[in-house]
Amino acid sequence: MRVVVAMSGGVDSSVVAGLMHEAGHEVIGVTLQLYDHGAATGRKGACCAGQDIHDARNVADRLGIAHYVIDAEAAFRAAVIGDFAESYAEGRTPVPCVRCNQHLKFGDLLGLARDLGAEALATGHYVRREDGPEGAELHRAVDARRDQSWFLFATTRDQLAFSRFPLGTMPDKDAVRAEAARMNLPVAEKPDSQDICFVPSGTYADIVAKLRPDAAAPGEIVTEDGAVLDRHQGIARYTVGQAKRLGAASGHVVTRIDAARRRIVVGPRGAGGREVRIAEPNWLIDPPAAPFRASVKLRAGETPHPAEIDIARNLVTLDTPALAAPGQACVVYRESRVLGGGFIL
């Protein structure tokens, strides 16, 4: 079987390429160049640029597989970085990894894989794909610490059917590195990339300030009734649920962001609501007509909340109140399986 492997130059995707090659597949490695090659060379913590492209090529040479580099900088800036800055300027808290998966890895790259005559796209994501009675299913990884299922909720059923995730059954990262060492891959001890790959130094707020200076403009920190408690240095530095960097408003939590008035609104800790509305829903099940019970995660690393899901109304009703940050994902689970989700309004 011809398989395209998304190779970032890190240990995870390199091991995937090696495992697919050992399984007897015809492997084609593809690296999406997301930044200017020269400017990115040597940037610690970056991904998919400079040294990473060099590492991916070395791994491909070691395995004896084809390797191509695709210039995806313009698409990445438009779909990921542009959306990232715009969201913060509008008071939302974006998830750039979801947008990158949605538009580049399982959009453009998967389309390229099909154009190359491949029968599958394999990536280094820590998730499991299982074949169920209604087709391919998305499940949490065995390694709960590295599970990335929340970030793949926007993957369509067709994309999921075409995709393979060999690392989903790995017990931990040590096992992945052991595989890399066994295959004598040059990246076996390479450090992991950081969460936001395009912010290798400084802070994400610096990136937002360059693209949307209005998001870095100072403003007021106020209570729900409008009482001014302190000043802030830009709404891009805050998210709903945040309890740090509130100055004289210490002891409160951010309950919403009023982007039009450049105000950070705070309330007592424990504040929250039960209703969560979502946009851009994507479902990996045949949507039932009636509301149903499931659990949801409003942030990647949090404990799931029991809830009622009304697909027809794009409405999630939590059993207990919680703070939901606009722009983040509300992902619906039934045990280990991802049923779908959407972006929080």
From Swiss-Prot:
Q: Name one GO molecular function term.
A: tRNA binding
As for subcellular location, the record says:
Cytoplasm
Give the domain of life: Bacteria
Region (Interaction with tRNA) spans which residues?
146-148
Active-site residue numbers: 100, 197
Catalytic activity line of the entry: S-sulfanyl-L-cysteinyl-[protein] + uridine(34) in tRNA + AH2 + ATP = 2-thiouridine(34) in tRNA + L-cysteinyl-[protein] + A + AMP + diphosphate + H(+)
Gene Ontology process terms (BP): tRNA wobble position uridine thiolation
| A GO cellular-component term linked to this record | cytoplasm
Q: Which SUPFAM superfamilies match?
A: Adenine nucleotide alpha hydrolases-like
Q: What is this protein called?
A: tRNA-specific 2-thiouridylase MnmA
Source organism per UniProt: Acidiphilium cryptum (strain JF-5)
